[in-house]
Amino acid sequence: MSRRLRILVAVGLMVIGATVVWRHYRYARPVGEGPAGPAVPHEAFASTWSDRNVVLLGLGDSVTQGLGASPGRMYFRRLVTNPPDEFANMQGICLSRVLPHLEPLNLAISGTTSIECVDYQLPKLTPYDAETFGVVVITTGGNDVIHNYGRTPPREGAMFGARTNEIGEWVENFDRRLDTIADRVRETFPGGCHIFIANIYDPTDGDGDIQHAGLPSWPEGLQVLAAYNEVLARFAKRQPDVTLIDMRAEFHGHGIHCTHFWHREYRQNDPHYWYWDNLEDPNDRGYDAIRRLFLIEMARILPAKL
């Protein structure tokens, strides 16, 4: 083999190797294994919080319904009870351990927008007696933003592709719908309640390059998402019986840039993808992280309210 040919072969192998490495860091989305998310303090679940009748009510979209989770791994179910093969650091950390008279009721439906939550889920609620306390978990608004994936012109409830100068009325209506949801929940639980509502995560890890996840480019997508998350934050701030679960911050670094060690959101301790195949919903590890976020806030708030 001539010297020139050896050089060409070496260069070719280097190009192939560089291409393989580039494709890995651009497209690889390893999910990892084991626990995910923050630690939950064991001591908060060491004794009973209350002997009252308590209903755990789920409202909203596919995240609360559990789409993308393996059987028994959705966050709502994991709030209630631990799966048989629970991680060692989560054994005994669940609501049924501290609320012996807990009744779970999950009305969340995959694909539901905040409009449909008001129109179809709230009418299913019937008041409980004054002895019953409501613990309400909600994920809503994400489908308002991502539907209809660029297949139709942007509209309220399906804003994908919208510009920020188009969404003012839609954002105001979302704000009003959240108040409607809270009012209806309070009517359902005259004995008291507390609402835990999550904000909306961003699978682009703050870059807004949704086109790298297989959807059309959306130049103002981050601004639209931020407008909805600002509404959720204001809603929780003005309502004394509402707590915001910061799902967005926890999921940053676990989206489509999870393997990019140079990215500002890179999570060195867990550089893995927490989303399911459809991009919209969590995988099992993502649901683990979500239940931990809810449990931490519940342990902080509920013992004093029950």
Where are these regions (language model features)?
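N-terminal secretory targeting modules
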Residues: 1-59, 63-84, 96-98, 131, ...
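Alpha-helical cap/lid subdomain in secreted, periplasmic
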Residues: 2-6, 122-279, 284, 288, ...
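Short beta-strand segments
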Residues: 60, 108, 138-140
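N-terminal carbohydrate-binding/catalytic regions of secreted carbohydrate-active enzymes
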Residues: 65-128
